Amino acid sequence: KAKSQPADFEQFWNSKVSTLCEPNVLEQKEISNPASGYKGYIIKLDMGSADPAYAYLTYPQNSENGTLKAAIIYHGYGVNKISPIYVKNTVSLSVCAHSMELDGTAEYYKDMQAKLDGYGFKKVGDTENSDKEKVYFKNMLLRDLQAARYIMNNPLWNGKDLTISGGSQGAFQATAVAALCKKATELNITIPWLCDIGGETSGRINSNFRPSFTEALSYYDTVSFAAMLNKSCNVKIEAGLGDRTCPPSGVTALYNAIKAPKSILFTQNRTHE
């Protein structure tokens, strides 16, 4: 069992969701070399007064409205270029964790890496992780959710099948979005990060790569989002018994918090990979 979540956890996040503007496309650029048989675009989504969200949108050519499943993938920690995904009979989004152009120059990404170096981690003299409103992951998750809201409004979606996936930081994002969007039918996550934040204060193994515990970070615990998952969402988890970044104690707390249909595969000696 994880540390107790804040009493107003759901209220906090529901209030953030309620402030999101419509997920309108501010800019759409066609990908020059998508996979054969697919259309692909870079999309920039409106976040109102906050920085926009960016994602790759792909779907099979000549698809008719209302006929496609939907899939969303989120990515691991870092400030790196991402790639589109191509899934049969599916309209898909590959979502950038940051408000960052997807077709920038090498110099642009170098600058972004310097700007976002150590994001999410409290630095000396920095109060970011002392205030739940200022935690870097707040706007990250809201951008992630806006991408999900976009695909749920996409006319190509069949309105039924929505699979959300991710690994490590991407698993944290995927779990949060599945919890907040309420319409995910499948959640597939591997080596999920930020589970049982502060568990080390109760004697559990500490992560070797996780922000130091603060009460504000309790609002960003993957376990608490997992407890909010819709009971119609089928959850599959893969994790490693040798993972010191996402210790198995935290992943087990995540599994135990889920009230939906679920399965977990722990692999002996698997580390954070």
Specify the residue positions occupied by each region the protein language model found.
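Primarily recognizes the serine-hydrolase "nucleophile elbow" in alpha/beta-hydrolase
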Residues: 145-208
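A short, hydrophobic beta-strand element of the alpha/beta-hydrolase
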Residues: 73, 94, 187-190
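Short beta-strand element of the alpha/beta-hydrolase
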Residues: 54-59, 66-78
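Histidine-bearing beta->alpha loop at or near hydrolase active sites
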Residues: 261-273
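The feature captures the conserved acid-bearing segment of alpha/beta-hydrolase catalytic domains
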Residues: 198-258
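Glycine-rich His-Gly loop
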Residues: 47, 73-78, 97, 240
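Cap/lid segment of the alpha/beta-hydrolase catalytic domain
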Residues: 82-87, 91-142, 199-201
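N-terminal targeting or regulatory segments adjacent to alpha/beta-hydrolase or S9 domains
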Residues: 1-39
